Amino acid sequence: MKDDPIRIARASYEAYERKDRSAIEALIAEDFHFSSPLDNRLDRKTYFARCWPNSQRIAAFDFIRIVRDGERIFVTYEARNVDGTRFRNTELLTIHGHQIAEVEVYFGWSIPHPAPAGGFTNSSP
């Protein structure tokens, strides 16, 4: 796994499923940054304080797409929460060596989608 960025990415999601903090800590670089529509370049310490507690809600990730572009891995997944709700996101992980240096999360939608096929909802994100 040491030099395979796709395996490193997969291992990070597996650590979330297992709630294995020591496994995820070994995969996250000291100079790590995390961004999402709600978070702007959180450092490693803040990421673990703010985001790691969400692992308690995650039951599983089903990978739709995992694509490598050099040191970057694009991951689209459907996640299942322990309460049975589901959602879909896409993430861009940057791998340096054998650790994750950066994650960008792009929020997707709930499953099932709240809009009918061919339609839309009237609420804004």
Q: Where are the language model's segments positioned?
A:
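Short, well-structured alpha-helical segments
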Residues: 25, 44, 48-49
